[in-house]
């Protein structure tokens, strides 16, 4: 694990007011660490509102089986298969789309070749939300990835309850033990897990996991937000003898970009910014994949 964790500051309740007690400690060293530290507080607040056991009971009461995210990627009619992202903003680029309608964007994706759809559920840094996940779930039939920064099992159960078919697990923010445990939880709930890496050490850790099926290679360094497609080329070469589906993520804008990562070994791509910034995201997706070869 490359990112430091920091438990939530203790709270003191006085009458109707709540104060966060300051504790000694340094500031986050990068944006990824800032996000993770915020998630510690966010999930802690969720657990106070709805304890984990109650959340688990609600999940057990679900009757609908999750859609098969991995199968949808494998069976996509084009290569690479596309996971199109519903994304309003990012810490590095700010607001990507002012007239943001998650349902309309998701429906446009589904109608124009997306094998799966990724929905940002982080509110503070990406202006997403679980409400968007629920609304998109009700509007489209393709499998959905809950895109967030998972650091506790609670988030996996919440994603399952609110309509996700897959969750993102980021190696840079999880220990080896947590990766194994979270992967097992996701699979036990019928969810696929896209396990994301950015470096060779992260990939080596992830390849040691049992029952690994999906690996996301993020071309963006989450500490600096710099993108480089050479990351996919370098890391995909280490996976050629593995029965895995590789997803290249970030920095993909043109057909030439898709060709490059496909030739490197990626069978799928996750694309967000280059689509949502266009006047018609569905048309942008169609133009990007419309002339792709059949799988």
Swiss-Prot record:
Main enzyme class: lyase
Taxonomic source organism: Synechococcus elongatus (strain ATCC 33912 / PCC 7942 / FACHB-805) (Anacystis nidulans R2)
Pfam families: IGPS (PF00218)
Protein family membership: Belongs to the TrpC family.
Protein name: Indole-3-glycerol phosphate synthase
Catalytic reactions on record: 1-(2-carboxyphenylamino)-1-deoxy-D-ribulose 5-phosphate + H(+) = (1S,2R)-1-C-(indol-3-yl)glycerol 3-phosphate + CO2 + H2O
UniProt xrefs under NCBIfam families: PRK00278.1-4 (NF001372), PRK00278.2-4 (NF001377)
EC number: 4.1.1.48
Pathway in which this enzyme or protein is active: Amino-acid biosynthesis; L-tryptophan biosynthesis; L-tryptophan from chorismate: step 4/5
Keywords: Amino-acid biosynthesis, Aromatic amino acid biosynthesis, Decarboxylase, Lyase, Tryptophan biosynthesis
Residues forming coiled coils: none
Keyword Amino-acid biosynthesis: yes
GO biological process, any: L-tryptophan biosynthetic process
Molecular function terms from GO: indole-3-glycerol-phosphate synthase activity; phosphoribosylanthranilate isomerase activity
InterPro entries, per database record: Aldolase_TIM, Indole-3-glycerol_P_synth, Indole-3-glycerol_P_synth_dom, Indole-3-GlycerolPSynthase_CS, RibuloseP-bd_barrel
């Amino acid at each position: 694990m490359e990112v430091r964790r920091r438990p939530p500051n203790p709270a003191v309740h006085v009458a109707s007011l709540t104060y966060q007690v300051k504790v000694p400690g340094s500031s986050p060293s990068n944006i990824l660490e800032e996000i993770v530290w915020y998630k510690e507080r966010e999930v802690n607040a969720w657990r106070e509102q709805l304890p984990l056991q109650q959340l688990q009971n609600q999940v057990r009461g679900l009757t609908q089986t999750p859609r098969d995210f991995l199968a949808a990627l494998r069976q996509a009619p084009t290569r690479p298969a596309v996971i199109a992202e519903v994304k309003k903003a990012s810490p590095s680029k700010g607001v990507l789309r002012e007239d943001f309608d998650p349902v309309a964007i998701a429906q446009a994706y589904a109608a124009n070749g997306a094998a799966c759809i990724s929905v940002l559920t982080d509110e503070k840094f990406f202006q997403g939300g679980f409400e968007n996940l629920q609304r998109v779930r009700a509007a489209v039939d393709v499998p959905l990835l809950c895109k967030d920064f998972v650091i506790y099992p609670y988030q996996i159960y919440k994603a399952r309850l609110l309509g996700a078919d897959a969750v993102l697990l980021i190696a840079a923010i999880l220990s080896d033990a947590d990766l194994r445990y979270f992967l097992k939880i996701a699979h036990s709930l019928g969810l696929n897990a896209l396990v994301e890496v950015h470096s060779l050490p992260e990939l080596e850790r992830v390849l040691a996991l049992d029952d690994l099926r999906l690996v996301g290679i993020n071309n963006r360094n989450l500490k600096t937000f710099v993108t480089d497609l050479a990351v996919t080329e370098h890391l995909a070469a280490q996976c050629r003898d593995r029965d895995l589906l590789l997803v290249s993520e970030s920095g993909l804008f043109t057909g030439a970009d898709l060709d490059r990562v496909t030739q490197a070994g990626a069978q799928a791509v996750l694309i967000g910014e280059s689509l949502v910034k266009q006047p018609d995201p569905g048309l942008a997706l169609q133009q990007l994949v419309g002339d792709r070869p059949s799988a």
